[in-house]
Design a protein with these regions (language model features):
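Short pre-active-site segment immediately N-terminal to redox-active cysteine/selenocysteine motifs
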Residues: 30-36, 41, 74-77, 89
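Flexible coil segments in periplasmic/lumen-exposed cytochrome c-class electron-transfer proteins
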Residues: 28-32, 80-110
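Electrostatic cytochrome c docking/interface patches
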Residues: 13-29, 63-66
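A short secondary-structure junction motif
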Residues: 41-44, 74, 100, 104
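Detector for the c-type heme attachment site
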Residues: 37-43, 83, 98
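Bacterial N-terminal signal peptides
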Residues: 2-14
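Periplasmic c-type cytochrome electron-transfer domains
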Residues: 65-80, 97
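Gly/Gly-Pro-rich "capping" loops immediately C-terminal to redox-active cysteine motifs
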Residues: 27, 39-69
Length: 110
């Protein structure tokens, strides 16, 4: 009987949804590497290139994939931060940025 309980616990952990730490990691990465130029989703260098939803869409960015590519490789005056953000960092920060843009940056920590 004990083995059955153990098996059920392991099965429950295996099929449980992934923890929501990607957003937390994205927020931490944003705070550490992006907020200097993009405080509250703005842009202190180029005012029209903010991280607000309207500006993202106007600049052809339709989701986190494009944001991750820009974070990794850079675009225009923005340098790429792929090495700084690490293997999954660009995806995590891009997901977080996209969530904030969807909420008009009202729920962000910055």
């Amino acid at each position: 009987m004990t083995w059955l309980v153990g098996l059920l616990l392991m099965l429950g952990l295996w099929i449980a949804p992934a923890p929501a730490h990607a957003a937390a990691d994205g927020a931490a990465l944003f705070e550490a590497h992006c907020v200097g130029c993009h405080l509250n989703g703005g842009n202190i260098i180029r005012r029209g290139k903010t991280l607000k939803l309207k500006a993202l869409e106007r600049n052809g960015i339709q989701g986190p994939l494009e944001i991750a590519m820009i974070a990794t490789e850079g675009r225009g005056q923005m340098s790429g931060y792929g090495e700084v953000l690490g293997e999954d960092g660009a995806d995590a920060v891009a997901e977080w940025i996209w969530q904030q843009a969807q909420n008009d940056w009202h729920n962000g920590s910055t």
